[in-house]
Design a protein with these regions (language model features):
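Short beta-strand->alpha-helix junction loop in the catalytic core
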Residues: 1-3
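Helix N-terminus capping/helix-initiation residues
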Residues: 5, 109-113, 192, 240
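Structural motif corresponding to alpha-helix initiation and N-cap regions
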Residues: 5-6, 29, 70, 206, ...
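Radical SAM enzyme [4Fe-4S]-AdoMet core and its adjacent flexible, acidic
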Residues: 10-160, 169-170, 174, 178-184
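Accessory C-terminal segments flanking Radical SAM cores
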Residues: 85, 102-103, 133-252
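A generic local structural motif
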Residues: 6-10, 200-201
Length: 254
């Protein structure tokens, strides 16, 4: 968002994307300076959003909640409402590699209890009373009535490598933005796109996730996945203690 100027806005108006996602890291310049080390980052991002709106380009605001912007969470939603832009704030953050083996209170991200509480609070605000009540009832029902699963490895259940893919800044096509495999050069003309896509589908199908998670009674309301397992544990079949606590606390707060 900080890089969007009049020239770029005009470019996107002529070459219209389906949507541009802009991450707001805070609701004021002070937060941007503290978190992103950019004194005027908030002003620049808002200017970028206003330019995209001016040129009638569809925009969505994303938020990534950590300790340093925790108190800005509701103000970020206010900004979305002001500009009539949908907002989605993520309260679960992947850990950095150096944080995998450190206690939660030493992480830059929120501890799982605070992250779960914020998740419920934010979802309530984003959904409104009626829709949130339906969501809460459904989630609690699933948490309380799901039987223990079979003792077998799980598999990728999201759209990655099934109906979606990403191309990163290096031009590598992958099933998931977080996972580094499978990965192929999108600009390698040796194979056509469908050949690359079929390779990605096949290799994604071969990824196995935790047997323990497959058996868990909270599996239908938990955010764990192959990407989270790798980020948290360094292994597709790892079990994240952070996500276990995050899920239990989410259900409790509903």
């Amino acid at each position: 968002g900080t890089l969007i100027n009049e020239e770029w806005a005009e470019f996107f108006a002529k070459n219209k994307p389906r949507r541009i996602n802009i991450t707001l890291y805070g609701s004021k310049n002070e937060t941007y300076e503290n978190l992103c080390h950019m004194k005027d980052g908030f002003d620049k991002t808002i200017r970028g959003i206003e330019l995209l709106k001016k040129y009638e380009i569809d925009v969505k605001i994303n938020g990534s909640l950590v300790k340093k912007n925790f108190h800005d969470r509701m103000e970020i939603i206010d900004i979305g409402e002001k500009y009539d832009i949908p907002v989605r704030i993520d309260t679960y953050m992947y850990p950095s590699v150096r944080e995998r083996t450190t206690p939660f209170n030493f992480h830059e991200r929120l501890n799982p209890e605070d992250a779960a509480k914020a998740r419920v609070e934010i979802l309530h605000r984003e959904m409104g009373d009626e829709l949130f009540e339906q969501y809460a009832k459904q989630t609690i029902y699933l948490a309380e009535h799901t039987e223990e699963g079979d003792a077998c490895p799980g598999h990728m259940t999201c759209r990655a490598g099934q109906s979606s893919f990403v191309v990163n800044w290096q031009g590598m096509i992958r099933s998931c933005i977080v996972l580094d495999q499978p990965s192929y050069d999108a600009f390698d003309t040796t194979d056509d796109f469908m050949t690359l896509w079929n390779k990605i589908v096949k290799e994604t199908e071969e990824i196995k996730t935790s047997m323990e998670c497959s058996q868990c009674k909270l599996r239908h309301v938990c955010n764990t996945c192959a990407a989270a397992a790798v980020a948290e544990c360094g292994d597709y079949e790892g079990v994240s203690k952070y996500l276990c606590e995050y899920t239990k606390e989410t259900v409790r707060n509903l």
